[in-house]
C-alpha cells in the first residue's frame, strides 16, 4: 500500500497530481467520502487528529484501534476495498499534554505513536512544535526535531513489531496558526519562508541521523508549511501564488518531498488546483465538510418546518442551540461579540465549532427525527429547489434520489468533488 509514495513520485515527475485528506470522524462525512472515492476509483486518505483520537479516547471517545475499526467497518459495508484506504494520524506529538512537564508529555506522546502505528495507521505526522509546561516559548528547531526523531524511532520499532516491516510514510513540520482555523479575525498571513522550511528539514535530517534513522528519509514524503491559506469565523484568506512562489520553487530541489497544506477549507476550486500545481500536493480538509453537512441539515430542517406540523417537528436547530448553550466548552473561547454575534457564529461560523456537538445524544435523536419526518413521503421538488438548489438539478436529471440521506451525502460530495478535481493532475 504505497499510494502516497507513488503519488509523490508521479508529482515529482511532472504530473501535477495530489491527494486530499478527509479530516473528520462524522459517519455521514466518512460515508460521503468513501462513496465518492469508490465512484471515482481513487484511494482515500482519512486522518484522525491527536485531539480527536488518542490512547485515552480523545474527544470522540475513540482510540486509534477503535477509529480504524469504525472506518473499516463503514468501508466494508460500502464495498470499498481496504487496500485503497489510507489512514493517517495528524499532529501526533505532545499536543494534548502541553500543560504537563515535557518529560511526561513526551512519554504520553510515545504511547500515542505506539497506539496509532499498532492500529495500522500508515501516514504519520510528527509534530512536536508545541511548548510543554517547563519548555521555553517558542521551542528551537533542534528541540522540535529531536523530539520528532524520538517519536519516529518509536514508530519504526512499533511497526516492525506488529507488521514485520517498517512501511510508514511520514510528514514533518507544522503550520501557523494552530490547527482547526484561526481564533482571531484575519487580514494578512505570513507565508513560510524558504529559509525556515530548509531549517526545519535540516534540523530533522540531523536529528534523524543521530537516532540512526538515515534510511527512512525517503519515506518522509511531506513538510507541513503555511502557503498563505487560512480561515476565521467569517473570512477566508485565499491562496496567492505569487506570495508562495519562492517556497514552491524551493521544494523542487528535494527529490522525494512535497508540501502538505492545512486549513485549505473554503478555498476556491481554482486556488485548490493551483496549490497542487505549486507542490502543496496534500490538501487537508475537515471543517468545510462538516460545514457542508450542517448546511444540508439546516436546509432539511427548513423544509421540515414547511411540511410538518410544528408539534411534530424535530426541532433540530433549537435542540442544537440549547445543547451548545448548555455545554459551551467547545465554542466559548472561540466566538466573541454580543449575544447575536455569538448566536450567528454558533450556527454559521466557518470554524464550525458545531461539529463537536453532532455526537450528542439529544442532537442525534433530533437528527434521526428529522430524517424520519422527511422520509415518510416524497419531498416536493419546489422545496428542494428552494433550499438545496444544487441537489435539485441532480434530482431533476435523475442522478440523485431525493431522500434526506442522499441529499445530505450529495451536498457533502460537492465539496469533495472540488478537492478531487484539484488533485487529479495532468
Curated annotation (Swiss-Prot):
Q: In which pathway does it act?
A: Carbohydrate metabolism; D-tagatose 6-phosphate degradation; D-glyceraldehyde 3-phosphate and glycerone phosphate from D-tagatose 6-phosphate: step 2/2
Which stretch is the leader sequence? none
Pfam families xrefs: GatZ_KbaZ-like
Tell me the GO BP annotations in alphabetical order.
carbohydrate metabolic process; D-tagatose 6-phosphate catabolic process; phosphoenolpyruvate-dependent sugar phosphotransferase system
Top-rank lineage group of the source organism: Bacteria
Entries under InterPro entries matching the protein: Aldolase_TIM, GatZ/KbaZ-like, GatZ_KbaZ_carbometab, TagBP_ald_KbaZ
Q: Name one GO cellular component term.
A: plasma membrane
The free-text function statement in the UniProt record for this protein reads: Component of the tagatose-1,6-bisphosphate aldolase KbaYZ that is required for full activity and stability of the Y subunit. Could have a chaperone-like function for the proper and stable folding of KbaY. When expressed alone, KbaZ does not show any aldolase activity.
Known NCBIfam families for this protein? Answer: agaZ_gatZ (TIGR02810), PRK15458.1 (NF012002)
Q: How does it assemble?
A: Forms a complex with KbaY.
- Annotated family: Belongs to the GatZ/KbaZ family. KbaZ subfamily.
Protein's name in the database: D-tagatose-1,6-bisphosphate aldolase subunit KbaZ
Organism in which the protein naturally occurs: Escherichia coli O8 (strain IAI1)
